[in-house]
Amino acid sequence: MPKVHLPNYGEFYEKRHFIPGMREPECIELAGQETLIGTNLLFACKQLPAFVLAAEVCEDLWSPIPPSCAHALAGATVVANLSASDETVGKAAYRRELVCGQSARLLCAYLYADAGHGESTTDMTFAGHNLIAENGSLLADAAPFAGEDAVTELDLGRMVQERQRNTTFMPETNGYTTVEFELPPVELALIRP
């Protein structure tokens, strides 16, 4: 999944090494296999129709119009953010607000997976601050520097229902490719009340 918004301020100098990723999916060969690359990809579970996954990368969430906005309008009920967000004073609280706000605005589950402390450098410290929010509520919060996973259940049926009820949530699927995948259901004990 390519990154769309490249930070080039403060401690970030990504534009000297990278260019923004393309939105329209293209087929490339990688490790001897053909695969799609691009930001406008949705991954739909055959067994759970309400589970439609999309992804964005780190800075994309912090931008004025994150790719996740288009992902949700295209049908994503779960957005994953693969991030290497460094730690500064007050950033963990701000990150929580961003993740919760985006999940509320998009009527989706938002999974935020941060680089861990073992990935820190001499220039930046990463805390492994992993978060899961659903429709504005923070469901799981792995404390920074604790080395924990964020784990919970998601009520995807509720997300679909909320979108159907909200008349200003207008789906727009142009330019998106959906890749179906299989995920056989497994019975688990619920951990969420």
Residue ranges with predicted function:
Residues M1-P193:
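Enzyme catalytic cores with a strong preference for nitrogen-chemistry domains
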